[in-house]
């Protein structure tokens, strides 16, 4: 299996409360963070989609909207909505605010898709990264079951589904832009 045979979905539906503004629209090199991620991953994957509660991008991207079945704001709903759009395949899911994840990290996770796992996510010494990994589309119903019980955390899947945590030493590759200072620092590194 090759990366260019797979689909990628960039999650852009977070509340961005710590950032104080919508992270998906932060500007990097004359484009917003969403466009930055879509451009990068379009060179790697078959298709790149954007996941959000509504179309805040004026039809600029292939959008997967959160399902209207549940009136919640959660990563589990986003994952359920994403996986419901695909049939019998792995999908790479990444939060828009993880701009340093790239092909090297993906290639380290890729071999585990051929093994007997349904979830393959990145893990660093300090964190598991549930919004950086491959999820099999067959998990949509399991996500729905959690939502029906008002369980919103993606991490709940890991105890029920065969999951591979792919170990990475470098925390920096999985930088998450939660605060404006982190965004400013990352922006200055791009120059």
Curated annotation (Swiss-Prot):
Molecular function via GO: GTP binding; metal ion binding; molybdenum cofactor guanylyltransferase activity
Protein family membership: Belongs to the MobA family.
Protein residues bound to Mg(2+): 97
Keywords of the record: Cytoplasm, GTP-binding, Magnesium, Metal-binding, Molybdenum cofactor biosynthesis, Nucleotide-binding, Transferase
One GO cellular component, as annotated: cytoplasm
Gene Ontology annotations of biological process type: bis(molybdopterin guanine dinucleotide)molybdenum biosynthetic process
Binding partners and assembly: Monomer.
Xref: SUPFAM superfamilies: Nucleotide-diphospho-sugar transferases
Cofactor(s), names only, from the UniProt record: Mg(2+)
The protein's name: Molybdenum cofactor guanylyltransferase
Cytoplasm is among the record's keywords: yes
Enzyme Commission designation: 2.7.7.77
Catalyses which reaction(s): Mo-molybdopterin + GTP + H(+) = Mo-molybdopterin guanine dinucleotide + diphosphate
Pfam families: NTP_transf_3
Annotated GTP binding sites: 11-13, 23, 66, 97
Compartment list: Cytoplasm
Keyword Nucleotide-binding in annotation: yes
Superkingdom as given in the UniProt entry: Bacteria
Comment field on protein domains: The N-terminal domain determines nucleotide recognition and specific binding, while the C-terminal domain determines the specific binding to the target protein.
Principal location listed in the UniProt entry: cytoplasm
Role noted for this protein: Transfers a GMP moiety from GTP to Mo-molybdopterin (Mo-MPT) cofactor (Moco or molybdenum cofactor) to form Mo-molybdopterin guanine dinucleotide (Mo-MGD) cofactor.
């Amino acid at each position: 299996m090759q990366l260019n045979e797979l689909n990628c979905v960039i999650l852009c539906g977070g509340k961005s409360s710590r950032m104080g503004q919508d992270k998906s629209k932060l500007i990097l090199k004359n484009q917003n963070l969403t466009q930055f991620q879509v451009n990068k991953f379009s060179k790697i994957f078959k298709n790149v989609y954007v996941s959000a509660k509504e179309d805040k991008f004026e039809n600029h991207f292939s959008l997967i909207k959160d399902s209207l079945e549940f009136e919640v704001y959660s990563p589990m709903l986003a994952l359920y909505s994403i996986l419901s759009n695909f049939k019998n395949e792995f999908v790479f899911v990444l939060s828009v605010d993880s701009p340093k994840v790239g092909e090297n990290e993906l290639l380290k996770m890729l071999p585990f898709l051929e093994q007997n796992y349904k979830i393959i996510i990145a893990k660093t010494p300090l964190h598991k990264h549930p919004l950086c990994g491959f999820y099999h589309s067959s998990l949509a119903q399991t996500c729905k079951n959690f939502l029906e019980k008002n369980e919103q955390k993606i991490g709940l899947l890991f105890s029920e589904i065969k999951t591979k945590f792919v170990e990475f030493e470098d925390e920096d590759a999985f930088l998450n832009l939660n605060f404006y200072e982190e965004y400013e620092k990352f922006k200055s590194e791009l120059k």
